[in-house]
From Swiss-Prot:
Regions of compositional bias (Basic and acidic residues) in chain numbering: 58-69
Keyword terms: Phosphoprotein, Protein phosphatase inhibitor
Modified residues (Phosphothreonine): 68, 119
InterPro entries on file: PPP1R17
GO MF term list: protein serine/threonine phosphatase inhibitor activity
Positions of region (Disordered): 41-73
Protein name, per record: Protein phosphatase 1 regulatory subunit 17
This protein's record includes keyword Phosphoprotein: yes
Aminoacyl-tRNA synthetase among keywords: no
Post-translational modification: Substrate for cGMP-dependent protein kinase. Phosphorylated by PRKG1 isoform alpha. Phosphorylation of Thr-68 and Thr-119 is required for its phosphatase activity.
Tissue: Highly expressed in cerebellum.
Example of a GO biological process term: central nervous system development
The encoding gene: PPP1R17
Length: 155
């Protein structure tokens, strides 16, 4: 159980407060010796400090992105090349990778299959055995609202 009595503070001798106690004097010597022996410049610590030194070296080798000036090269316009562009930017006439020649582009569009959105849904009436279809009940294409305004495609 805990008692509620007041405890007397420990009495320390005057020589201990003055650090004249022989048991504590060696601590000052150890701390001085430790400071002399430790040289942080000789051995870098492993971990973050080593990476930081490597980053400093790599920063010196190549400039940061914000330090490099942006080179403005005018956009490619097919068939338009002047002597000024060729001399100033050392540009050679070439076709961009992402864009095709317009003539080839049109033929590719014709050969592509239509998207699912563009194809009409075929409506087949339910099959009933022994029943013949009337002329009005032939299979027909259901045309979406967008297509009703324009061309109607039936398959």
């Amino acid at each position: 159980m805990m008692s509620t009595e007041q405890m007397q503070p420990l009495e320390l001798s005057e020589d201990r407060l003055d650090k004249l106690d022989p048991r504590c004097s060696h601590l000052d010597d150890l701390s001085d010796q430790f400071i002399k022996d430790c040289d942080l410049k000789k051995k870098p610590r492993k971990g973050k400090n080593v990476q930081a030194t490597l980053n400093v070296e790599s920063d010196q080798k190549k400039p940061r992105r914000k330090d490099t000036p942006a080179l403005h090269i005018p956009p490619f316009i097919p068939g338009v090349f002047s002597e000024h562009l060729i001399k100033r930017y050392d540009v050679q006439e070439r076709h961009p990778k992402g864009k095709m020649i317009p003539v080839l582009h049109n033929t590719d569009l014709e050969q592509k299959k239509p998207r699912r959105k563009d194809t009409p849904a075929l409506h087949m009436s339910p099959f009933a055995a022994g029943v013949t279809l009337l002329r009005d009940e032939r299979p027909k294409a259901i045309v979406e609202d967008d297509e009703k305004d324009g061309d109607k495609i039936a398959i």
